[in-house]
Amino acid sequence: MKIKNGDTVIVISGKDKGKTGNVIEVLAKKNKVVVEGVNIVTKHQKANGRGVESGLIKKEAPIDVSNVMYYDAKNKKGTRLGYKFEDGKKVRFMKSNNETIK
């Protein structure tokens, strides 16, 4: 999976199409990512005896990695990623302009 924690991505399909956000968590085995401010769901929280209150909680749910693209801030659009070797190290790069990603 070429998307990593901390990457800025844009949603390319679904109810949140066009929104951008940072990747909070990558679920590699499920091929999903959790993006900040995207795919917000309402969870019904049940109270327990240890001080956790009941109520409705809004939180981000995972979204399939095929529905997001890496966001290129310079060009203000999504781009595909690839891997290449520079100085013996494997680095990610944007396929649209061949810039490496730190």
Curated annotation (Swiss-Prot):
One of its GO terms (biological process) is translation. The keyword DNA-binding does not apply. GO terms for cellular component: ribonucleoprotein complex; ribosome. InterPro entries: KOW (IPR005824), Rib_uL2_dom2 (IPR014722), Ribosomal_uL24 (IPR003256), Ribosomal_uL24_CS (IPR005825), Ribosomal_uL24_KOW (IPR041988), Translation_prot_SH3-like_sf (IPR008991). Coiled coil: none annotated. GO terms for molecular function: rRNA binding; structural constituent of ribosome. Pfam families: KOW, ribosomal_L24. CDD domains: KOW_RPL26. Keywords: Ribonucleoprotein, Ribosomal protein, RNA-binding, rRNA-binding. NCBIfam families: rplX_bact (TIGR01079). One of two assembly initiator proteins, it binds directly to the 5'-end of the 23S rRNA, where it nucleates assembly of the 50S subunit. Part of the 50S ribosomal subunit. PANTHER family: MITOCHONDRIAL RIBOSOMAL PROTEIN L24. Belongs to the universal ribosomal protein uL24 family. This is Large ribosomal subunit protein uL24. It comes from Finegoldia magna (strain ATCC 29328 / DSM 20472 / WAL 2508). The lineage of its organism: Bacteria, Bacillati, Bacillota, Tissierellia, Tissierellales.
